[in-house]
UniProtKB/Swiss-Prot annotation:
Gene3D superfamilies per the UniProt record, alphabetical: Globins
Family affiliation: Belongs to the globin family.
Protein's recorded name: Hemoglobin subunit beta
Sequence positions bearing Phosphothreonine: T13
Function per UniProt: Involved in oxygen transport from the lung to the various peripheral tissues.
Gene Ontology MF annotations: haptoglobin binding; heme binding; hemoglobin alpha binding; metal ion binding; organic acid binding; oxygen binding; oxygen carrier activity; peroxidase activity
SUPFAM superfamilies: Globin-like
Length: 147
């Protein structure tokens, strides 16, 4: 559960309505793989990840980034029940994929950076603070199965 004020929730919802999930999802996942290259081990089937350009232009990275942000969108619609919303994804990433849960926090922080880049002055410190709460809540929910 993420505790947002009414103002924070409105800010998150308003900005998210302007997000191009295809573009932002691919950029966020791509940046995660470039900035934290050890995360690439979970995506060996994606083909060429040999350079930043290869990662950022990889169609499988872009497609999976879109899928990731689709799940994030679901979370935004269920902020009062993030653990329930992400229960199956938590189980998948824990039991089958063996993803280090720290990676969820890293991806959340990268997403915040990408949103700041895309929205500039509109991504005020107050909006960032609200999004930091949301990505922390989502990361916690995704890591729930690990506890």
């Amino acid at each position: 559960m993420v505790h947002l004020t009414g103002e924070e929730k409105a800010a998150v919802t308003a900005l998210w309505g302007k997000v191009n999930v295809d573009e932002v999802g691919g950029e966020a996942l791509g940046r995660l793989l470039v900035v934290y290259p050890w995360t690439q081990r979970f995506f060996e089937s994606f083909g060429d990840l040999s350079s930043p350009d290869a990662v950022m232009n990889n169609p499988k990275v872009k497609a999976h980034g879109k899928k990731v942000l689709g799940a994030f969108s679901d979370g935004l619609a269920h902020l009062d029940n993030l653990k329930g919303t992400f229960a199956q994804l938590s189980e998948l990433h824990c039991d089958k994929l063996h993803v280090d849960p720290e990676n969820f926090r890293l991806l959340g922080n990268v997403l915040v950076c990408v949103l700041a880049h895309h929205f500039g002055k509109e991504f005020t410190p107050q909006v960032q603070a609200a999004y930091q709460k949301v990505v922390a809540g989502v990361a916690n929910a995704l890591a729930h199965k690990y506890h």
